[in-house]
Amino acid sequence: MLKEFKEFISRGNVMDLAVGVIIGGAFTAIVNSLVKYIINPFLGLFVGAIDFSDLVFKIGNATFRVGSFLNAVINFLIIAFVVFLMVKGINKVLRQDKKEEAPAPKDPQLEVLEEIRDSLKKLDK
């Protein structure tokens, strides 16, 4: 069982996933910092509140933390946009690889010469 687990962990997909999760966690910290220390103060210039996490409204005893939700939405949009750019870049590289692998179209003159050659071979028989 230990051998099977070692084989499972050693597969490329599992290792890629582990690296992705670790980098994703670090990237989330960067995005949180970007939103909290750069984007929110910039938006705060227009709204009047620099820290959106304190933005709340109350109805009766219920407290709605709209600011925390806005922070989460901004984080999500930034992460989604970066992932979109990464996928777009990867797809572009993959398309270029496929173009390089595709055989070059035959030269029309070469095709005519091959037909002539084949016809001459038939005549010799």
Curated annotation (Swiss-Prot):
Keywords: Cell membrane, Ion channel, Ion transport, Membrane, Transmembrane, Transmembrane helix, Transport. One of its GO terms (molecular function) is mechanosensitive monoatomic ion channel activity. The lineage of its organism: Bacteria, Bacillati, Bacillota, Bacilli, Lactobacillales. It holds the Pfam family MscL. Signal peptide: none annotated. It is found in: Cell membrane. It is a multi-pass membrane protein. Belongs to the MscL family. One of its GO terms (cellular component) is plasma membrane. It comes from Ligilactobacillus salivarius (strain UCC118). This is Large-conductance mechanosensitive channel. Homopentamer. InterPro entries: Mechanosensitive_channel_CS, MS_channel, MSC/AndL, MscL_channel. The gene is mscL.
